[in-house]
Amino acid sequence: MKFTKMHGLGNDYIYVDAISQKIENPNEISKFVSDRHFGIGSDGLVLILPSDVADFKMRMFNSDGSEAEMCGNAIRCVGKFVYDKKMTDKSTISIETLAGIKVLEMTVENGKVVLVKVDMGEPILKAETIPVLSEKHPVIDEEITAKDYCYNFTCVSMGNPHAITYIENVEEFPLEKIGPLFEVHEKFPKKTNVEFVELIDDSTVKMRVWERGAGETLACGTGACAVLTASVLKGYVGRKATVKLLGGDLIIEWNEKDNHIYMTGPATTVFEGEIDI
């Protein structure tokens, strides 16, 4: 299997052209290649496939083998993958995902993609669609308790569920202890990604994320979009803000005209190779 390892702000996946090669049992392959000791090492596997409704189709799998709807960092890399490999000559393309069709605008320098702006679509605020068990609409400051920990969560879906809460010091927060408790909380029928956010100023927030099925990662694009949405809903920031993640910064904008969230950030190729599976 030929592959390319890429990352968006350190959120790394193994990318495979599944148009020119047949990939069977991607769930197991993802578990294998993701292993940082016995595999290649990544947060998961991304397949680029043909699409009947868009330029390309993306399927992505977490390091535990589960399939995910969408990943903002991964989709930026998909744009770079197909452009840099001359699978397309368009700098604006559409990608089919389980969370719908996403449109990417790519900034190209010297024939290579350096930045990708993604139309992430409208944030979903309806409790049953997120899904979260709540009577509120939108779900702002829903008090949720797990063991001895209690937080007020604002819940948003960007095609995948996110629960966002605000804390004083995100760097020193014991995420690996508390994140998993809320990821699998009964309030979230499909589990959830959990974001802990520190407010820096009215145009900057800093976050750490516990990703559903992957644990803490250096960055989560849909998480950054959900955090911006929650922060606007709570009146903390304006409609355009810098979201600081462990792996770097994303610029997120909630456009008032079309109600869509736009995410701009880098995409980086690490190396290419071939592996027996």
UniProtKB/Swiss-Prot annotation:
Name listed for the protein in its UniProt record: Diaminopimelate epimerase
**What are the subcellular locations of this protein?**
Cytoplasm
| Annotated site location: Could be important to modulate the pK values of the two catalytic cysteine residues | 162, 211
The record's Gene3D superfamilies line, in alphabetical order, gives: Diaminopimelate Epimerase, Chain A, domain 1
Question: Gene encoding it?
Answer: dapF
Q: What is its main location?
A: cytoplasm
List ligand-binding residues for substrate.
11, 62, 72-73, 160, 193, 211-212, 221-222
| Active-site residue numbers | 71 (proton donor), 220 (proton acceptor)
EC number, as in UniProt: 5.1.1.7
Q: Where are the transmembrane segments?
A: none
Q: Which GO terms describe its cellular component?
A: cytosol
The scientific name of the source species is Methanococcus maripaludis (strain C5 / ATCC BAA-1333)
Q: Name one GO biological process term.
A: lysine biosynthetic process via diaminopimelate
